[in-house]
């Protein structure tokens, strides 16, 4: 299955949540679902299954995860003791591409995924080009030393934008070193807002 590269505005309007900043801007201007009967579709109540499916799709699109990967993450979360939905969100937050995004090294998760794919990111000093890699507490995520001389990363440092960036509390950002440390597991409130994880659990528990 190919990764989604379609119009984020349409998807954001269909799901009722901005899956990117651009998607949120479009949603603010045009909140109705796309299509001729968008306003009517917005008023029509979803079935239980429809609501569960929509929540799963929201999380998939926001975090940029394919269906097979998403199911695997859910199964991993379900095997753990505790609240399955919250642990699922923790796994999504701890994906390497999401961490690169949360640290401010990229402006979107798609860009963060590209940086990882192209070998610009190291974990504990080792090049890691797998966006789905799950980071652990204590690990250090950084821009590869050989990549720091590239214009993009030099601008990140020279512009001071990282000094103003607010990383979540579970990550400690070192702007000068283009690195960040995982200091804790992400909490429920650290995950992307607008996702009802319990509906996702219900979807896979049918």
Swiss-Prot record:
Pfam families according to UniProt: Ribosomal_S4, S4
One cellular component (GO) term of this entry: small ribosomal subunit
Keywords from the named record: Ribonucleoprotein, Ribosomal protein, RNA-binding, rRNA-binding
Tagged with keyword Ribosomal protein: yes
Family matches, as PROSITE patterns: RIBOSOMAL_S4, S4
Positions of the S4 RNA-binding domain: 94-157
Protein's UniProt keywords contain RNA-binding: yes
GO molecular function: rRNA binding; structural constituent of ribosome
InterPro entries assigned to the protein according to its UniProt record, in alphabetical order: Ribosomal_uS4, Ribosomal_uS4_bac-type, Ribosomal_uS4_CS, Ribosomal_uS4_N, S4_RNA-bd, S4_RNA-bd_sf
Signal peptide: none
GO process terms (BP): ribosomal small subunit biogenesis; translation
Family in the record: Belongs to the universal ribosomal protein uS4 family.
Biological function: One of the primary rRNA binding proteins, it binds directly to 16S rRNA where it nucleates assembly of the body of the 30S subunit. With S5 and S12 plays an important role in translational accuracy.
Assembly notes: Part of the 30S ribosomal subunit. Contacts protein S5. The interaction surface between S4 and S5 is involved in control of translational fidelity.
The protein's name in its UniProt record: Small ribosomal subunit protein uS4
UniProt source species: Chloroflexus aggregans (strain MD-66 / DSM 9485)
Gene encoding the protein: rpsD
């Amino acid at each position: 299955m190919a990764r989604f590269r379609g119009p984020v505005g349409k998807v954001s309007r269909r799901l009722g949540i901005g899956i990117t900043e651009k998607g949120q801007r479009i949603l603010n201007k045009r909140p109705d679902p796309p299509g001729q009967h968008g306003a009517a579709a917005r008023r029509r109540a979803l079935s239980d299954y429809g609501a569960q499916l929509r929540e799963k799709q929201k999380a998939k699109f926001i975090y940029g995860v394919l269906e097979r990967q998403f199911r695997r993450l859910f199964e991993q979360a379900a095997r753990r003791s505790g609240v399955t939905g919250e642990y699922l969100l923790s796994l999504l937050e701890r994906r390497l591409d999401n961490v690169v995004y949360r640290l401010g090294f990229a402006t979107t998760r798609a860009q963060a995924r590209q940086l990882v794919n192209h070998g610009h990111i190291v974990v504990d000093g080792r090049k890691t080009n797998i966006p789905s890699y799950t980071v652990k507490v204590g690990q250090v995520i950084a821009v590869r030393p050989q990549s720091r001389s590239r214009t993009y990363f030099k601008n990140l440092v020279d512009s001071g934008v990282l000094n103003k960036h607010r990383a979540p509390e579970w990550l400690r950002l070192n702007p000068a070193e283009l690195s960040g440390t995982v200091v804790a597991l992400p909490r429920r409130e650290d995950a992307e807002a607008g996702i009802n994880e319990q509906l996702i659990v219900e979807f896979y528990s049918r």
